């Protein structure tokens, strides 16, 4: 499976844009429409598998909640474990947490303390890169547990929101299958 312009265009075209959601002036990129299209969904996972299959990852970490939809099938296809990063109080075993800043306020993410070890080479997966706060916090969680993380994959990137710039200092190789301009 080759990451060519036709494949990437099919993925991008399967993502619906919803104007003025969740508030006026926002163009919401709805990745759930991609999930409704089995050809686009399968192609998305297939392209990620092809890109990462020879890189020696031992775990895929997906962020709540749509990162699960791409991270879990990717991990399954790569034959490695999947680790969820969730909002507080959603994981049953002992966790560590990391807070991060949002446009208005802050949020917190958690991971099980025994989910990542210093032997793990981790790929982080989410549906969307916007401001980069979620991925920054996720990478900090993984590194705090001793995991090696230098790659993050996204279906969508919104470069105008500054996520790539925010993550420049984190020594991450970023892959986005498609970009959309604007907010």
Swiss-Prot record:
NCBIfam families: apt (TIGR01090), PRK02304.1-1 (NF002632), PRK02304.1-3 (NF002634), PRK02304.1-5 (NF002636). Pfam families: Pribosyltran. It is found in: Cytoplasm. One of its GO terms (cellular component) is cytoplasm. It catalyses: AMP + diphosphate = 5-phospho-alpha-D-ribose 1-diphosphate + adenine. Keywords: Cytoplasm, Glycosyltransferase, Purine salvage, Transferase. Belongs to the purine/pyrimidine phosphoribosyltransferase family. This is Adenine phosphoribosyltransferase. It comes from Shewanella piezotolerans (strain WP3 / JCM 13877). InterPro entries: Ade_phspho_trans, PRibTrfase_dom, PRTase-like, UPRTase/APRTase. One of its GO terms (molecular function) is AMP binding. Pathway: Purine metabolism; AMP biosynthesis via salvage pathway; AMP from adenine: step 1/1. GO terms for biological process: adenine salvage; AMP salvage; purine ribonucleoside salvage.
